[in-house]
């Protein structure tokens, strides 16, 4: 599960308690996990354009949260003379800036190329606006955004769940979701060494996930919680 960013947050655009009630009724084993881990505490960050959210995702890829946040802040600060304090650069600003400006912020060559490709594809309409994306299906959004260099299906699925608040996304390739599924449904023990053959397969998850529609994002959130529970990071409700 992506690390939460600092800053203002908002509620999801759906009622999590409705999702929890439906999931508990549809899947008794999931209901037991929900009882052990408590209610949904998911919060979304303030709304961003797809361009801004994906730019941040690119910067955060394969980095610890603190290091990524520092690089992101440096990049934003480098554009302050053009954009003002705290404002995100536009796609055109990113295309026009010299490589040295981005390199000085701590960005690698691959991330610079990915950011410039994101900017170009935003300007040519491949990356939709926030208004347009709200009218698109999850699969349409994925199809559009994975055309950007450095953006794969998993990154878009995380954007759908944690930025756009889409309720019915099942990221079957996410390690945490696969492990949480194995802990909850396949008998994986919290102390057991995890090997690939012990994790849930795509087919197993998709089959059971049919029970969870149209709330698969919330079910996925509970798979991550199952991992936290196994690691002793959750105090179970009394």
Give the residues covered by each predicted segment.
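C-terminal accessory module of base-excision DNA glycosylases/AP lyases that mediates lesion recognition
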Residues: 1-41, 138-139, 153-238
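Alpha-helical scaffolds flanking conserved acidic
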Residues: 49-53, 89, 93-97, 205
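Residue-level marker of regulatory loop/turn positions in helix-turn-helix DNA-binding domains and
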Residues: 48, 52, 134, 148, ...
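Generic alpha-helical structural context detector
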Residues: 56, 73, 77, 116-120, ...
